Regions:
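Basic, low-complexity terminal or inter-domain segments flanking catalytic cores
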Residues: 92, 168-169, 190-488, 492, ...
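Secretory-pathway/luminal and periplasmic proteins that interact with or process carbohydrate-rich
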Residues: 181-187
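Positively charged, polyanion-binding regions of nucleic-acid-associated proteins
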Residues: 131-146, 340-349
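Phosphate-backbone binding and catalysis cores of DNA-processing enzymes
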Residues: 1-142, 237-297
């Protein structure tokens, strides 16, 4: 609006991550110069123009080619390809049997490495049965598991999908409602950290969160663990607000309450002590074959103590940490006097279909190996604020359908991926663009140069694939409308997109 009105008046920006009264007042007392966000604006504006140009022209092009409305997008099509590729992996998967030999040593059972065929397994079993078993080595190692980071929106969506079956959009909607109720901070964040200025507030918020979770905090919260000024993006990580202490819990819908408790529990985990345990690996040798047994002895439960309690509270399922502790009489060189053995057969399993949780993870990783600049952060495809919408879009378009938690491609979705060229559906293209958009945000790349590249990409796409000989005649789509004609949408003025009716 500022540009359209040709306004040149100075502008201050209210930049807050919470709509609590004190945060709003503090925000107005510390208004930001709008010019501080010029590069962020340029990057976001270039992103939206690129998405519009690629989506509008790609959609018109392939809809006309196949006489069917085929929605194509810079992010949605690579996302669909991820799902289709997984379906192809499942359909082409051939299960294979393999075997291991289990050696029962009385106090524990050790297992051999994978054996590819049954005759070999039987031969090993025969040799072991006649052999002498002894403990070849014992290796002990103290290990620490750091607490998880604070939630960003993608992490919250993945956890809610895994625990409650919520779709990414449902989680975002519930979080938005909690934000408007002043119970959590701005939800559409991609950061896992907070600024150093929030150190004291983190201590206060942990106390408030413990009240929501009915948890007794007997340690001093380690606020430094969640502070990283360099990694805080436009908004800090998702947090509860101090208002949760006075909230009418009974008035909050159950679905929203689960999300609020997830956010509160994540804060408590993040500032809790480490989980420490001792791992033990015992190697037993018999008839020139090694067998391995693994043990775990917990030294300090740390944050996992809260995780067990909170996940049980949220899901109604009892959670526990399994320990395998070996007695002190298990020492190197010990001969196992009485041992028994048997063959265990196993089957390789196909990869699982994507859920909202695993698809968001795949989107975060997609194309990361193709980033051209090592100095930019690898963020995959789509932004964390838009990934839920992308999933819902490809479902709405009829390319994907839900089967329980699973996301399954339809025949139309599979055919679309077969129809469009690699440069449209490959995450590599998006990764290259994402790296340049980040450089624009840093002031290290020209928005005009980026848009010139997009314009050229779209022009080449239409020029190349509008020819009839590029139509895959093996594909058939159900005709939905009569196509009158096809023309390239004018791209010399990409800053003023127009509605195409």
């Amino acid at each position: 609006m500022y540009k359209l009105c040709r306004c040149s008046k100075p502008v201050k920006r209210l930049w807050i991550s919470s709509v609590e009264k004190n945060d709003i007042i503090d925000g107005f007392n510390n208004l930001k110069n709008d010019s501080d966000y010029d590069r962020l604006f340029q990057s976001g504006y270039a992103r939206s123009k690129a998405d519009w140009l690629v989506g509008m022209n790609g959609t018109r092009l392939f809809s006309a080619m196949y006489n069917n409305f085929l929605s194509v997008g810079r992010v949605q099509t690579p996302t669909l390809k991820i799902i289709v590729d997984r379906e192809n992996e499942i359909n082409n998967f051939k299960s294979e049997k393999y075997y291991t030999v289990l050696l029962n040593c009385g106090e524990f059972t050790a297992e051999s490495a994978r054996i590819p065929d049954l005759p070999t397994a039987k031969k090993i079993l025969q040799n072991v049965n006649a052999g002498t078993a002894f403990i070849k080595s014992i290796k002990k190692e103290s290990k620490k598991v750091s607490p998880p980071k604070l939630f960003n929106i993608a992490d919250l969506q993945k956890t809610a999908n895994r625990l409650f079956g919520y779709t990414a959009k449902q989680t975002l909607d519930y979080a938005q409602s909690l934000y408007e109720k002043k119970l959590i901070t701005y939800p559409r964040t991609d950061s896992n950290y907070v600024n150093s200025s929030m150190k004291d507030k983190i201590i206060q918020l942990t106390a408030a969160a413990s009240g929501i979770m009915s948890a007794e905090i007997s340690f001093t919260p380690d606020a430094d663990r969640v502070i990283n000024d360099k990694k805080v993006t436009d908004h800090h990580a998702l947090l509860p607000t101090l208002s949760v202490s006075d909230a009418d819990i009974e008035a909050i819908p159950d679905s929203e309450m689960k999300i609020l408790r997830l956010i509160c529990s994540q804060l408590i985990y993040a500032v809790s002590p480490e989980h420490i345990y001792e791992s033990t690996a015992i190697t037993v040798s018999c008839a020139d074959t090694d067998f391995t047994a693994l043990g775990k002895k917990i030294s300090q439960m740390g944050w996992k103590e809260f995780q067990l309690k909170f996940v049980s509270l949220l899901t109604g399922k009892e959670m526990s940490v399994k320990e395998t502790i070996f007695t002190d009489n298990i020492v190197e060189g010990l001969v196992i006097e009485n041992h028994s053995e048997k063959i265990a057969d196993h089957q390789t399993t196909p990869p699982k279909r994507y859920t909202d949780s695993s698809l968001i993870s795949a989107m975060e990783r997609a194309g990361n190996e193709d980033y051209e600049d090592e100095n930019v952060e690898k963020k995959g495809i789509g932004t964390q604020a838009t990934q839920a919408g992308i999933i819902e879009t490809i479902i709405k378009r009829g390319y994907v359908e839900r089967s329980g938690k699973n996301l399954c491609p339809t025949q139309k979705g599979i055919s679309l991926i077969e129809a469009v060229p690699e440069e449209i559906k490959s995450p590599k293209t998006t990764a290259i663009w994402e790296s340049k958009l980040q450089l624009i945000e840093k002031g290290e790349y020209s928005p005009d140069d980026f848009m010139n590249e997009i314009n050229e990409f779209v022009k080449n796409l239409v020029d190349t694939y509008s020819k009839e000989d590029n139509i895959n005649k093996d594909l058939s789509f159900r005709a939905e409308r009569k196509v009158i004609g096809l023309s390239l949408i004018h791209i010399s003025e990409p800053t003023r997109p127009r509605l195409i009716s």
